[in-house]
């Protein structure tokens, strides 16, 4: 179920736009293909996007044919800018590209071939770190999950959104593996249906009981007492704990608070943007109207209707019970406690 695999200058991605009906691997051999794959959501999920971007820089560096370090770094910087322009909200994308570029710059005294190898090694290290991080998030998050709980999740923050195991689904997996009798309610997550297509599929692969619901049913099931907690992933977390995640997350958080249900965010510390104070500074990606007006190429809305399609929303920190990271669980007040995890 790994969404990505890199070997000998070729990045293989599981095309997530085709799941669950078709499991197709696409092979990317240049950075333009990598950038397009990120933009078109062949790969998605903040951690997976970050590592994919890092491998994209590695692939690009191999193709730069020059003996001039000045030309090499100028071309490498252009590549980094192009990859970073693909999706504006997920901070892991920028963090990952900047990290591999910094590794190259800090070793400027080495030969160009040695620098290329170091970029590749850094990307591989990031993949390894992500998997370890997700396992740790799962272990910490499992401490919050009680026997016989029903967990509501939104979008897909599982193995498909990371390099393996997952963040929000990592917590769910850890609880299941520890023997707890849990079940999951998965929002379908309009308009891209990551919950229906990806989360439900992932959980069924692992034999974790899952019930699929429409997004607008969540409040009903909370009021009926059928939901014990909500766990979601994150694409960017501000210093005060405000969290950007898939559109619809904010609504779930408000509903959870109204019904006295704990609302947890599970994310690695690489998703924390220490450069911004609040969620108001997080850019929100607006995607194609066709994602709303069409399903599988079939029009479901009137021709010419106006459409808004923000891909993310920001959940204010007051609705978040805790943030589960690989370094531990962060509780309010977030503006005091998050900075301790830098």
From Swiss-Prot:
Transmembrane intervals: none
Pfam family, one: IF-2B
InterPro entries per the UniProt record, alphabetical: IF-2B-related, IF-M1Pi, IF_2B-like_C, Initiation_fac_2B_a/b/d, M1Pi_N, NagB/RpiA_transferase-like
Site feature location: Transition state stabilizer: 155
Metabolic or biological pathway, per its Swiss-Prot or TrEMBL entry: Amino-acid biosynthesis; L-methionine biosynthesis via salvage pathway; L-methionine from S-methyl-5-thio-alpha-D-ribose 1-phosphate: step 1/6
Gene3D superfamilies with a match to the protein in the record: translation initiation factor eif-2b, domain 1 (1.20.120.420), Translation initiation factor eif-2b, domain 2 (3.40.50.10470)
Binding site for substrate: 44-46, 87, 194, 245-246
Catalytic reaction list: 5-(methylsulfanyl)-alpha-D-ribose 1-phosphate = 5-(methylsulfanyl)-D-ribulose 1-phosphate
Single biological process term from Gene Ontology: L-methionine salvage from methylthioadenosine
GO molecular function: S-methyl-5-thioribose-1-phosphate isomerase activity
EC number: 5.3.1.23
Key words, A-Z: Amino-acid biosynthesis, Isomerase, Methionine biosynthesis
Catalytic residues, chain numbering: 235 (proton donor)
Entry similarity comment: Belongs to the eIF-2B alpha/beta/delta subunits family. MtnA subfamily.
Cited function: Catalyzes the interconversion of methylthioribose-1-phosphate (MTR-1-P) into methylthioribulose-1-phosphate (MTRu-1-P).
NCBIfam families: eIF-2B_rel, PRK05720.1, salvage_mtnA
Matching PANTHER family: METHYLTHIORIBOSE-1-PHOSPHATE ISOMERASE (PTHR43475:SF1)
Name of the protein in its database record: Methylthioribose-1-phosphate isomerase
Name of encoding gene: mtnA
